[in-house]
Amino acid sequence: MNHNKLKKWILMLWGTLFLVSCIEQDTTDELYQIFSDAHQYQLDTNPISATYAGNHKLNDRMPSVSTEQIEKNLKFWKSIYYRLDKIQLNDLSKNDRVNHKIFSRIINSRIRGIEYKDYCMPFNADSGFHTGLSRLYKAMPFKTVEDYKDYIARLLDFPRYFDEQIANMRIGINNGISVPKVVLKGYEVTIKTHVVDSYEESAFYEPFRSFPNSFNAEQKLEIKKMGQQAVMNGAVKAYASFLNFFLNEYYPNARTTLGASELPGGMDYYNFKIDHFTTLNLSVQEIHEIGLKEVARIRREMEVVIESVEFKGSFSEFLNFLRTDPQFYATSPEALLKEASFIAKRMDAKLPALFNRLPRLPYGVAPVPDDLAPKYTGGRYVGPAEGSKEPGYYWVNTYKLDVRPLYNLEALTLHEGVPGHHLQNSIASELNDLPEFRKDLYLSAFGEGWGLYSEYLGIEAGFYTDPYSNFGRLTYEMWRACRLVVDTGIHAMGWSRQQVIDYLSENTALPIHECTTETDRYIAWPGQALSYKIGELKIKELRKFSEQELGRKFDVRDFHDTVLGSGSVPLDVLEDQIQDWVAAQKN
């Protein structure tokens, strides 16, 4: 009897466990179906994203950004969020709970952005929907006649796409939603560069300058002729229309206020941007105070460097010396690029001491394209399209060499190249155990926090031995600390543009030109500037915690591998992962 009862109990237990296992598997399957449905929708509705993702089925068109399509998008993303909300988290593995949390954040942010009508401002102070299109062809194949015809059809679709963007900007103007007028002076250069008199002058004509050997003379001639017409009647026509709209309608009617809190969404909108770019629950006042404390700390370190070079004069006089003395500036674009390349190569040799895992993808050093350079930052990392044979690129701005100081170059190069964005993004792309949406995910607080932390790693790697270069590192760190002060100042405290320029110029050795372009960037891109320092402080805090907890067991290579080993994550998720790693190391 007891034996039968035991047998019955075991069968019931087995059945219960089997049922639980089935429920858990069903829940996991549903979660990954949500990921798949969202990914497919993104590919189907955004042909540019599809092209960069290596999916070339829609290479013959541009996206739709019509109000009808935006409404469809909002409805779809809300349905995805509803499905995510129904998932029973207890039925998921720990890793999939993290995946659920990250994806829910992404979708919620996407919904809120549409509801706040972010699509009515499709550009900021240095880039926008129109600025990268001339390089889109690099992500497209040109092996067959159909490949070329796809590109031709895409060029001819530019006017429709630009008209829809213009219609959205008109909606914005009528609702008080626009990029502030004060940052738009001279912005037309980013548009005008593509309004040319001949297809030969257009960057969009580049794919028609050469053809595969398999093409016969007749095919080449026909495609060239079609391409010439498509460039002029498609791309150039669209940019000319946008230029006319910008100069005669958008700029004259752009808002004269600065802060995000002055937009219809008010402080709620700025708080949304804070959450989006920091991934932490921080108030405006908390961020502002963190910034002020960091500014004071870094200023003390700067004063020590000034004393070490025995400079006779005030802090502002030292900054003026750095901004004006020719010894600190390259004499040619080639010289600046060579110096950046040399720094990058030096850092390559230091990586094995800091990381166990290194990416396979190489990267190059190149100038910022001419059409972007005048309003662009000092440098930026640009990754390759998925499936392309291109490397990553560290872009260095060679426009106006007298505002591109060499003393900042070590910090800039480590931030944008390695161990910064190139290493971080390339490792993420090679993580095979992550869902697809996380492989190319870029959360600003994590990414830019890592970039700034990478500048700090230069100290451990033997950089900044020259006191002026060390001051350059400090001025870059000070710059990011100032961002916490000025971003909150602009968007919540009523700071003026000149107030921000003055604050940057008084506290950093950035050239006045860069102080101005950076100020315009912060005005036009609320919240983004907060991500650097907030992210870096969190990574440093977690490293200090790990060192204290592990003592002699701490290995910086393992720590860095753990930070980068899950791709881009919200900072609270990163904290959980580091705490788990520390606990595992202890055991």
Locate predicted features.
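N-terminal hydrophobic targeting signals that begin at the initiator methionine
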Residues: 1-2, 23
